Design a protein with these regions (language model features):
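C-terminal structured "cap/appendage" subdomains that terminate the fold
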Residues: 294-344
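Gram-negative/organellar outer-membrane beta-barrel architecture
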Residues: 1-142, 231-232, 243, 323, ...
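Short coil turns and loop connectors of transmembrane beta-barrels in diderm outer membranes
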Residues: 20, 65-67, 126, 192-196, ...
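One-face residue pattern on beta-strands with alternating periodicity enriched for small/polar residues
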Residues: 9-15, 39, 58, 115-121, ...
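C-terminal outer-membrane beta-barrel translocator/porin domains of Gram-negative envelope proteins
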Residues: 1, 72-268, 277-300
């Protein structure tokens, strides 16, 4: 069996220390003190089953206010082209059949994502956090919103373009995604003394496909598990809902709604080492009932019963400029259908443990 996998990526950007946009007065450009960024990215993936190319171009603005406490970013235009030049015939026949797995079939097709977005970050620590200074209690708020495909959909309607056999409008025979997506996260750090603190965060997000799309593109869907989520699960291995993936297909373990919450006790150990005890909770869900994700749909009378919980310990190496993080998580409450509901009562290290290595704190 050929398991070779190659991925190559390159990206470049150019930044201008001013707000670059026609028809805007010079006085406004001076007052806003924004930077303008143009970026290009290219990613090439070659697997035994397929070859995949993702090419992107972006135009964005960034600026900060109130001694660096607030940061704004506007993605005026972000274009992503997903191109599948080759798919292995047997893989295509076995898995990329609309009747067998619409989720896979949808995400292994050429697709265009033309989006705009806005993000806002507020951190009460401001410049002290940027300088890695010792600070007291602080909190942060993160908000993101993006939409894709709306202008293209209006133009398609006005031009009376014909749809393809999947009931999608296309641009140069390439179907385009249409959706809205929003995320909100709140985090707080409470200092107990000069060696100990407690940090917690709660966040959520939702992505809704409409118009020209029946599904959110995989790149824009949510996942759960991993170093910055519910750490009793490996990355992309939890959810949606009670869904349990016996086939090991990571694309099936993605969703349109996400909830996450964590609390950590953090302490200084010695030298540059820090320790942590943590509890995480969360999951993902779909907004529709997909055949390949049974039990994944979000329901108000069920979702709270499907919250996964994990606990664990962490070791962090604070090198001033960045933090190396080693976390070990254990499953406590498992919502997956057919699995032990409360592994915390009968812990099995081989079954319940997940190790994570990451750079930076989880929140």
């Amino acid at each position: 069996k050929n398991d070779n996998y190659t991925e190559l990526g390159v990206e470049t950007s150019i930044n201008f220390p001013r707000f670059m946009f026609p028809f805007i007065s010079n006085d406004f450009k001076r007052r806003i003190r924004a930077t303008t960024e143009f970026g290009l990215q290219y990613n090439y993936q070659m697997r035994p089953e397929f070859t995949r190319i993702v090419a992107s171009g972006s135009w964005s603005y960034k600026w900060g206010l109130q001694r660096q406490r607030s940061q704004h970013r506007i993605d005026l235009l972000d274009i992503n082209y997903l191109y599948m030049p080759w798919i292995e015939p047997e893989f295509k026949n076995n898995f990329l059949n609309d009747e067998k797995n619409y989720l896979l079939e949808y995400n292994y097709k050429d697709r265009l994502i033309v989006r705009t977005g806005y993000s806002y970050i507020y951190n009460s620590a401001g410049q002290a956090l940027m300088n890695n200074a010792v600070i007291g209690n602080s909190y942060s708020i993160r908000f993101n919103f993006e939409s894709a495909g709306n202008l293209l959909y209006v133009l398609s309607k006005m031009s009376n373009l014909k749809k393809n056999d999947q009931d999608e409008y296309t641009i140069l025979n390439i179907p385009y995604a249409q959706y809205i997506k929003g995320d909100l996260d709140f985090a707080k750090n409470i200092v107990i003394d000069n060696r100990n603190s407690i940090a917690f965060h709660i966040g959520g997000g939702i992505a809704i496909p409409y118009g020209n799309a029946r599904m959110i593109p995989f790149e824009k869907r949510y996942f759960s598990g991993g170093a910055n989520s519910v750490r009793g699960w490996s990355v992309r291995s939890l959810g949606p809902g009670t869904f349990s993936d016996e086939k090991g297909n990571f694309m099936n373990q993605s969703g349109d709604i996400k909830l996450d919450a964590s609390i950590e006790y953090r302490t200084r150990l010695f030298w540059k080492f820090r320790g942590a005890l943590f509890v995480d909770a969360g999951n993902i869900w779909t907004i529709r009932e997909y055949q390949d994700q049974p039990g994944g749909k979000f329901k108000f009378d069920q979702f709270y019963k499907q919250i996964a919980v994990a606990y664990g310990v962490g070791l962090r190496l604070d090198l001033d400029f960045f933090v190396l993080r080693f976390d070990g998580g254990m499953k406590a409450i498992n919502p997956e259908k057919g699995k032990d509901r409360y592994p915390i009562l009968r812990p099995d290290f081989g079954r319940d443990f997940a190790f994570h290595f990451a750079v930076g704190y989880p929140f």
